């Protein structure tokens, strides 16, 4: 997210605590917060999708649901053509 938008979120939060927000400012704050949260969720999802879990013996123990997502995206050498990957 653009640093200017994050600064604006913080500015509106501070103003809300001190003098309160106008109607249009409340709408702006809600939109900015939603945009921030969506970006955060995308980032976390991307990070989690890139994880491969292995046990002490080096065996892949990644949950099947995550493996399927990784197959669809071609991550960690997984392929839709090879269901065992």
Swiss-Prot record:
InterPro entries: DUF896. GO terms for cellular component: cytoplasm. Residues 62-85 are annotated as: Disordered. SUPFAM superfamilies: YnzC-like. It is found in: Cytoplasm. Keywords: Cytoplasm. Signal peptide: none annotated. Belongs to the UPF0291 family. This is UPF0291 protein SPy_1687/M5005_Spy1383. It comes from Streptococcus pyogenes serotype M1.
